[in-house]
Amino acid sequence: MLRVAGRRLSSSLSWRPAAAVARGPLAGAGVPDRDDDSARGRSQPRFSIDSPFFVASRGFSSTETVVPRNQDAGLADLPATVAAVKNPNPKVVYDEYNHERYPPGDPSKRAFAYFVLSGGRFIYASLLRLLVLKFVLSMSASKDVLALASLEVDLSSIEPGTTVTVKWRGKPVFIRRRTEDDIKLANSVDVASLRHPEQDAERVKNPEWLVVIGVCTHLGCIPLPNAGDFGGWFCPCHGSHYDISGRIRKGPAPFNLEVPTYSFLEENKLLVG
């Protein structure tokens, strides 16, 4: 029986706070006087009940905790996590002892520091400008593409009344050497009756030579030279007729044949583009 009683006593002591155990023996261990009982009843912690089951059940209560109170045990006896739960504090306390403090700078060196920072920013801005310019210029046409943008044509081999076709920027270009009759016929047309009114002098730089892009203005077909009702070009796709000056005279095309940018380098040298 003494052995069983000792086990019960040790189990009840393991659930009591350390401070409560240090204050005195459990109730019933001895026969104290009446004054000691009243004093112990006032100072006895609330979790000094002998039953371990009852103490554990109180831990599930929303208003009670199995962690000892401040008056029962010191914070030094508890782990850091338990102390944080026991005394929550919304104020953030920074550890200033683990951070190195630097003394304030010398005011006489601030001008040099500002100069270095400003110079660095200027260098960074210049590098950024060069990168932006390089990126923008990389999207422009290269030299070989620009060389193909212009086309030089020798006109000495073209007979009067004939038309030659050259390729410029992926499009056909019609170059026609007109005769005197062709020039008179182009100038005799009533411009007011045309769908897209243009004088013949507005479409040529030299009346002998007519230079137009060989793409129909309707749906982009290639007209046939020396064909149609007006002796110019005829589009076989939808039946558009152009005269000797490349102006639309009949059919669904809304505009005249486009005149590219060109110039005469010499009497028999033509530069398209």
UniProtKB/Swiss-Prot annotation:
Known cofactor(s): [2Fe-2S] cluster
Topology in membrane: Single-pass membrane protein
GO CC terms: mitochondrial inner membrane; mitochondrion; respiratory chain complex III
Membrane spanning stretches: 111-133
Lineage: superkingdom: Eukaryota
A biological process term (GO) from this entry: mitochondrial electron transport, ubiquinol to cytochrome c
Keywords, ordered alphabetically: 2Fe-2S, Disulfide bond, Electron transport, Iron, Iron-sulfur, Membrane, Metal-binding, Mitochondrion, Mitochondrion inner membrane, Respiratory chain, Transit peptide, Translocase, Transmembrane, Transmembrane helix, Transport
Protein name in UniProt: Cytochrome b-c1 complex subunit Rieske, mitochondrial
Organism, as annotated: Zea mays (Maize)
Classification of source organism: Eukaryota, Viridiplantae, Streptophyta, Embryophyta, Tracheophyta
